């Protein structure tokens, strides 16, 4: 995660303006990982023998509702205005919204945790607090 781009970067302006809110019912899953943990996981993978695909994601995915509250708390902004689906569908197209914003991604880092990798950031709230208040 970085505020300079990607999923968080695209969301920052509305949240900073106090217009951030959960998408639809907020029940879809969001998998995330801090940049520090991503780099550490890649280094760990280079030093350890692991076979098969590896998911580099934090061990605790969150719902969009929790994600939204965590960003709002980190920025000290309200998150009471939900984003009605017609708005992003009009702006970005239905296919993009359905695939990128609404698809549930409850991905777990099974190979990393089974192999003994230790995450530094396991909960979204403190990770976003540190990231967005730097």
Say what each PLM segment does.
Residues 1-10:
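Flexible, glycine-rich beta-alpha linker
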Residues 41-42, 48-95, 129-134:
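Mid/C-terminal beta-alpha module of Rossmann-like enzyme folds, strongest
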Residues 9-20, 28-62:
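Alpha-helical substrate-binding/gating segment
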Residues 99-134:
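C-terminal amphipathic/interface module of NAD(P)-dependent oxidoreductases
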Residues 12, 69, 109-111:
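Short glycine-/small-residue-rich flexible loop motifs, especially phosphate/cofactor-binding loops
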């Amino acid at each position: 995660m970085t505020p300079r781009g990607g999923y968080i970067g695209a969301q920052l302006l509305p949240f900073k303006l106090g217009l951030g809110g959960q998408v639809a019912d907020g029940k879809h899953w969001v998998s995330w990982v801090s940049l520090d943990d991503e780099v550490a996981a890649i280094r760990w993978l280079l030093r350890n023998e692991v076979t098969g695909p590896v998911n580099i994601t934090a061990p605790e995915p969150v719902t969009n509702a929790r994600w939204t509250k965590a960003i709002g708390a980190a920025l000290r902004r309200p998150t009471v205005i939900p984003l009605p689906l017609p708005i992003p569908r009009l702006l970005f197209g239905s296919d993009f919204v359905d695939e990128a914003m609404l698809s549930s991604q409850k991905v777990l880092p099974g190979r990393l945790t089974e192999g003994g990798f230790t995450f530094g950031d396991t909960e979204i709230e403190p990770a976003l607090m540190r990231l967005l208040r730097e």
